[in-house]
Curated annotation (Swiss-Prot):
EC class: oxidoreductase
Alphabetical keyword list: 4Fe-4S, Chlorophyll, Chloroplast, Chromophore, Electron transport, Iron, Iron-sulfur, Magnesium, Membrane, Metal-binding, Oxidoreductase, Photosynthesis, Photosystem I, Plastid, Thylakoid, Transmembrane, Transmembrane helix, Transport
GO molecular function, one term: electron transfer activity
Family note: Belongs to the PsaA/PsaB family.
Binding site for [4Fe-4S] cluster: C559, C568
Function: PsaA and PsaB bind P700, the primary electron donor of photosystem I (PSI), as well as the electron acceptors A0, A1 and FX. PSI is a plastocyanin-ferredoxin oxidoreductase, converting photonic excitation into a charge separation, which transfers an electron from the donor P700 chlorophyll pair to the spectroscopically characterized acceptors A0, A1, FX, FA and FB in turn. Oxidized P700 is reduced on the lumenal side of the thylakoid membrane by plastocyanin.
Compartments in which it is found: Plastid, Chloroplast thylakoid membrane
Organism: Arabis hirsuta
Name the UniProt record assigns to this protein: Photosystem I P700 chlorophyll a apoprotein A2
Primary subcellular site in the record, as a coarse category: plastid
HAMAP family: PSI_PsaB
Length: 734
C-alpha cells in the first residue's frame, strides 16, 4: 500500500474514515506525538521551521515595499503627508461597473486602488526613505534575506549541519546570543541608521551608499566620543519651527533628551529615539555578557536559581529544580516566550498611539485606530497561547519529584486559594460594574439622568496629576508649578514632556471621568475572568478533586464516557477554548472604548463620550449604531461609494461569525446523521455517484468541532469589527 497522509503517524494513516484527514491536520505540528520522534529530531525540526517562518516574514515585508513602489504614491505622499491618501496597491479587476471604478480611484491614482491604513508610509518616511527606488532596493534586499533564510533552514537539516541537543540546551550561550547579538547589536545598528540616514533625511540631507562616508552625521565627528564630551552631541537640537524633511529650523544634535513631540509631525523627536536605541544597545550588550559561556567567568543560570531560596522558608525550596524543569521543557519555554511577547504586543498598541514614533502618523486617524486594534487582538491570541502551552507543560513535562516543595510545586499546592481569589475578584467586578451601568440605564429610561451614579476616578486623576497633568487642579508633584521636580523638568530633563502632557492635540494622559471609570472596571472584569479561566485550566490540567487522573487523558479530551458523570468540558483545552471567547469579548470592550473616546476627541465633541458612556444604551446607540450608519449605507439604489467594500466585509464577517454557532451548538450525532443521509443520497444520484471516496465520511470529533466553531467565531468577530472600525473612521476623516 502506498504511503498515505499522514506519514508521521502510521496508526492514523490506516484509519478507514475521514478522521484520518482531520486528525492528520490537527497533529501535523505536534512533533512530539509523531512516530519515531527523538528529542534530537524534535529540536531540529523546530529550529528548521524557525528559518521558514523568517523566510515568510521577509517575503511578506518585501511584498509590501514592492507593491507600494510599483503601484503606490509614496513620492507624491511625501510632498503633502497630511492631505494625500497613501496607496497600498492597485485593484486589478474592479467588479460592479463604472461606479466602482470611480469610487475606488483616489489618492491621485489613475485607476482603482486600496488605501494603506498600516502606517508603512509614515514609517518609511521617518526612517529616511524618499524615493520609489529606495523602496525597490529594500524589497530586493528582503527578498535576498528570505532566500537566505530558506537556505539556512535546509542547511540545518543536513546531517553535517544539524545542531545537537546539547547546543539547544546551552542556556548561557543562548542568552549571550539573544541579548547581545539580537537585541544589543540590532539596537546599535538601528541607532547607526537613525544617526547616519534618518536624522540627516529629516534635515533635508539625502545620505546613501555613494556619499555615506563623506557626510558627517555631526559637525564634530567622533571627537566628542573619544574626549568624553558627550554632551556636545545633544547641543543645538532641531527647533520647534523645524519643517520635517527640510533644513529649515533644523539643528545639528544627534542624541538628545528633549521629551515631547516635534510640533509639526506630532511624533517623538528622532534625536530622542536615536538616544533611546543607543541606551538600549549598551544595556543589552552588557546584559548578554553576564553569563558563563566558554570562558568560565560570569553567572551560571543553574547556580543562580539553586541559590534563590527565600529566607524564612515561606516559599519552601525556592527555585531549586527549576533550571532543569524549564530547560528540558519546550512547552514551558514557549509559554514564557508567548507571555512576554503578548505583553510587549499590548504595550506596542498602547504606546503607538500615546507616543507616536512616526512622522504625521498621529494625524492619520484611521491608521491609528487600525494599529491599536490590530496589536491588541494579536496580544490577546498570544497571551492565551502562553497559558495553553503552560497547561501542556503540566501534562507532558512536569515532574513532581524534580520540583518537590519549590515555587512551582507550591503554586499547584495552593491552587484552590489562587482560583477562588480570582473568582471572587471577577464576581465582585462583574456585579458591581453591571449594577452601575444598569442603574444608570434605568435612570435615563425614566427621564431622570441626574439620578445616575457617577463616580469620578480621583485616584487615577491624582496619578495623572503627579505625572504633570495640570487640568484637574491637584497641584501635586509634577503638576505643582513651584516644586523642584517641575523646575528641573523645564531645564535638566525632557523639557518638552510636561508641555506635551498638557497639550490637547495628542493622546497623552487623556482627561478621564465617570464613563472611563465604568468601562475601566468592565475591562478589569474581562481581564480577571479570562485570567481565571486560563489559570484554572493550567493549574487543574494534571488533575482535580473531581478527576484526579486527568493528566492521563492528555491535553484535549471531550469526556471520560458516561460512567463518570461530570467529566465533560474539564480538559485543559476546554479552558483555553472558553478563555478565547472571554479574551475576544474583553478586547472588544477595550477597542470600543479606545475608538469611541478618540473619535469624539478628533471630532472635538468629547462631551458625547462623557455623557453617553455612563450607561449601556449610550454605548449601543451613540457608539455602535451611530457609527455603523456608514456601513449600512455602503451601497444603495444610487450605486456604490468607497466604503462599499467595508460594508460587504461587515456583512461577510457577521456571516462567518454566525457560522461558528453551527459548530458550537450542535455536536457529533446530529452531523453524523446528516452526513449519512447525504452520503446515501449521493450514492443514489445519477452522475454524482460516479464520484467515489475511499474514506468513510464521519462527523468531526467534539473537540474538533469546537475548534472549527471557535475559529469561525474569532475570525468573523474580528472581520466584522475591522470593517466597522475602518469604515466609520475613514468615513469621518477621509
Amino acid at each position: 500500500m502506498a504511503l498515505r497522509f499522514p506519514r508521521f503517524s502510521q496508526g492514523l494513516a490506516q484509519d478507514p474514515t475521514t478522521r484520518r484527514i482531520w486528525f492528520g491536520i490537527a497533529t501535523a505540528h505536534d512533533f512530539e506525538s509523531h512516530d519515531d520522534i527523538t528529542e534530537e529530531r524534535l529540536y531540529q525540526n523546530i529550529f528548521a521551521s524557525h528559518f521558514g517562518q523568517l523566510a515568510i516574514i521577509f517575503l511578506w515585508t518585501s511584498g509590501n515595499l514592492f507593491h507600494v513602489a510599483w503601484q503606490g504614491n509614496f513620492e507624491t505622499w511625501i510632498q503633502d503627508p497630511l492631505h494625500v491618501r497613501p496607496i497600498a496597491h492597485a485593484i486589478w479587476d474592479p467588479h460592479f461597473g463604472q461606479p466602482a471604478v470611480e469610487a475606488f480611484t483616489r489618492g491621485g491614482a489613475l485607476g482603482p486602488v486600496n488605501i494603506a491604513y498600516s502606517g508603512v508610509y509614515q514609517w518609511w518616511y521617518t526612517i529616511g526613505l524618499r524615493t520609489n527606488e529606495d523602496l525597490y532596493t529594500g524589497a530586493l534586499f528582503l527578498l535576498f534575506l528570505s532566500a537566505l533564510s530558506l537556505i539556512g533552514g535546509w542547511l540545518h537539516l543536513q546531517p553535517k549541519w544539524k545542531p545537537r541537543v546539547s547546543w539547544f540546551k546551552n542556556a548561557e550561550s543562548r542568552l549571550n546570543h539573544h541579548l547581545s547579538g539580537l537585541f544589543g547589536v540590532s539596537s546599535l545598528a538601528w541607532t547607526g541608521h537613525l544617526v547616519h540616514v534618518a536624522i540627516p533625511a529629516s534635515r533635508g540631507e539625502y545620505v546613501r551608499w555613494n556619499n555615506f562616508l563623506n557626510v558627517l552625521p555631526h559637525p564634530q565627528g567622533l571627537g566628542p566620543l573619544f574626549t568624553g564630551q558627550w554632551n556636545l552631541y545633544a547641543q543645538n537640537p532641531d527647533s520647534s519651527s523645524h519643517l520635517f524633511g527640510t533644513s529649515q529650523g533644523s539643528g545639528t544634535a544627534i542624541l538628545t533628551l528633549l521629551g515631547g513631540f516635534h510640533p509639526q509631525t506630532q511624533s517623538l523627536w528622532l534625536t530622542d529615539m536615536a538616544h533611546h536605541h543607543l541606551a538600549i544597545a549598551i544595556l543589552f550588550l552588557i546584559a548578554g555578557h553576564m553569563y558563563r559561556t566558554n570562558f568560565g567567568i560570569g553567572h551560571s543560570i543553574k547556580d543562580l536559581l539553586e541559590a534563590h531560596i527565600p529566607p524564612g522558608g515561606r516559599l519552601g525550596r525556592g527555585h531549586k529544580g527549576l533550571y532543569d524543569t524549564i530547560n528540558n521543557s519546550i512547552h514551558f519555554q514557549l509559554g514564557l516566550a508567548l507571555a512576554s511577547l503578548g505583553v510587549i504586543t499590548s504595550l506596542v498598541a498602547q504606546h503607538m498611539y500615546s507616543l507616536p514614533a512616526y512622522a504625521f502618523i498621529a494625524q492619520d486617524f484611521t491608521t491609528q485606530a487600525a494599529l491599536y486594534t490590530h496589536h491588541q487582538y494579536i496580544a490577546g491570541f498570544i497571551m492565551t497561547g502562553a497559558f495553553a502551552h503552560g497547561a501542556i507543560f503540566f501534562i507532558r513535562d512536569y515532574n513532581p519529584e524534580q520540583n518537590e516543595d519549590n515555587v512551582l510545586a507550591r503554586m499547584l499546592d495552593h491552587k484552590e486559594a489562587i482560583i477562588s481569589h480570582l473568582s471572587w475578584a471577577s464576581l465582585f467586578l462583574g456585579f458591581h460594574t453591571l449594577g452601575l451601568y444598569v442603574h444608570n440605564d434605568v435612570m435615563l429610561a425614566f427621564g431622570t439622568p441626574e439620578k445616575q451614579i457617577l463616580i469620578e476616578p480621583i485616584f487615577a486623576q491624582w496619578i495623572q496629576s503627579a505625572h504633570g497633568k495640570t487640568s484637574y487642579g491637584f497641584d501635586v508633584l509634577l503638576s505643582s508649578t513651584n516644586g523642584p521636580a517641575f523646575n528641573a523638568g523645564r531645564s535638566i530633563w525632557l523639557p518638552g514632556w510636561l508641555n506635551a502632557i498638557n497639550e490637547n492635540s495628542n493622546s497623552l494622559f487623556l482627561t478621564i471621568g465617570p464613563g472611563d471609570f465604568l468601562v475601566h472596571h468592565a475591562i478589569a472584569l474581562g481581564l480577571h475572568t479570562t485570567t481565571l479561566i486560563l489559570v484554572k485550566g493550567a493549574l487543574d490540567a494534571r488533575g482535580s478533586k473531581l478527576m484526579p487522573d486527568k493528566k492521563d487523558f492528555g491535553y484535549s479530551f471531550p469526556c471520560d464516557g458516561p460512567g463518570r458523570g461530570g467529566t465533560c468540558d474539564i480538559s485543559a483545552w476546554d479552558a483555553f477554548y472558553l478563555a478565547v471567547f472571554w479574551m475576544l469579548n474583553t478586547i472588544g470592550w477595550v477597542t470600543f472604548y479606545w475608538h469611541w473616546k478618540h473619535i469624539t476627541l478628533w471630532q472635538g465633541n468629547v462631551s458625547q463620550f462623557n455623557e453617553s458612556s455612563t450607561y449601556l444604551m449610550g454605548w449601543l446607540r451613540d457608539y455602535l449604531w451611530l457609527n455603523s450608519s456608514q456601513l449600512i449605507n455602503g451601497y444603495n439604489p444610487f450605486g456604490m461609494n468607497s466604503l462599499s467594500v467595508w460594508a460587504w466585509m461587515f456583512l461577510f464577517g457577521h456571516l462567518v461569525w454566525a457560522t461558528g454557532f453551527m459548530f458550537l451548538i450542535s455536536w457529533r450525532g446530529y452531523w453524523q446523521e446528516l452526513i449519512e443521509t447525504l452520503a446515501w443520497a449521493h450514492e443514489r444520484t445519477p452522475l454524482a455517484n460516479l464520484i467515489r471516496w475511499k474514506d468513510k465520511p464521519v462527523a468531526l470529533s467534539i473537540v474538533q468541532a469546537r475548534l472549527v466553531g471557535l475559529a469561525h467565531f474569532s475570525v468573523g468577530y474580528i472581520f466584522t469589527y475591522a470593517a466597522f472600525l475602518i469604515a466609520s473612521t475613514s468615513g469621518k476623516f477621509g
